[in-house]
């Protein structure tokens, strides 16, 4: 009985082998959406913490406000760069997928 079950599983894989490309496309869309959503969420949390720390530092020592703002903008650019890198990877997965022949 086990041998027949394994045979049917093997034949099922052969029967549906032509649908592999559409499954890769579907999973690429899901992966791009989830990846970009998580990257945006992480970026938003990181930017919020950066802004809160800058505001707290400026409140403690107003004389350092300019230097803190400069450092904050550099940190925000680095955080946003991570989200942009995720967007580039998602666009590659959607439009130039290396797994689709």
From Swiss-Prot:
Gene name per UniProt: atpE
Subcellular localization(s) per the UniProt record: Cell inner membrane
Transmembrane regions: 28-48, 72-92
Protein family per UniProt: Belongs to the ATPase C chain family.
Disulfide bonds: none
Annotated PROSITE patterns: ATPASE_C (PS00605)
Key words, A-Z: ATP synthesis, Cell inner membrane, Cell membrane, CF(0), Hydrogen ion transport, Ion transport, Lipid-binding, Membrane, Transmembrane, Transmembrane helix, Transport
One term under GO cellular component: proton-transporting two-sector ATPase complex, proton-transporting domain
Name of the protein this chain belongs to: ATP synthase subunit c
Protein's job: F(1)F(0) ATP synthase produces ATP from ADP in the presence of a proton or sodium gradient. F-type ATPases consist of two structural domains, F(1) containing the extramembraneous catalytic core and F(0) containing the membrane proton channel, linked together by a central stalk and a peripheral stalk. During catalysis, ATP synthesis in the catalytic domain of F(1) is coupled via a rotary mechanism of the central stalk subunits to proton translocation. Key component of the F(0) channel; it plays a direct role in translocation across the membrane. A homomeric c-ring of between 10-14 subunits forms the central stalk rotor element with the F(1) delta and epsilon subunits.
A Pfam short name: ATP-synt_C
Membrane topology note: Multi-pass membrane protein
Subunit description: F-type ATPases have 2 components, F(1) - the catalytic core - and F(0) - the membrane proton channel. F(1) has five subunits: alpha(3), beta(3), gamma(1), delta(1), epsilon(1). F(0) has three main subunits: a(1), b(2) and c(10-14). The alpha and beta chains form an alternating ring which encloses part of the gamma chain. F(1) is attached to F(0) by a central stalk formed by the gamma and epsilon chains, while a peripheral stalk is formed by the delta and b chains.
UniProt site positions, description: Reversibly protonated during proton transport: 80
InterPro entries: ATP_synth_csu_bac/chlpt, ATP_synth_F0_csu, ATP_synth_F0_csu_DDCD_BS, ATP_synth_F0_csu_sf, ATPase_proteolipid_c-like_dom, F/V-ATP_Csub_sf
Record-linked NCBIfam families: ATP_synt_c, PRK08482.1
Gene Ontology molecular function: any one: lipid binding
């Amino acid at each position: 009985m086990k041998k027949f079950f394994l045979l049917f599983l093997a034949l099922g894989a052969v029967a549906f082998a032509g649908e592999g490309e559409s499954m890769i496309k579907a999973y690429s869309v899901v992966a791009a959406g989830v990846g970009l959503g998580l990257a945006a969420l992480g970026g938003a949390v990181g930017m919020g913490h950066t802004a809160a720390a800058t505001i707290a530092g400026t409140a403690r020592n107003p004389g350092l406000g300019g230097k803190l703002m400069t450092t904050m903008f550099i940190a925000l650019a680095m955080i946003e760069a991570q989200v942009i890198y995720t967007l580039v990877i998602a666009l590659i997965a959607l439009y130039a997928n290396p797994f689709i022949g």
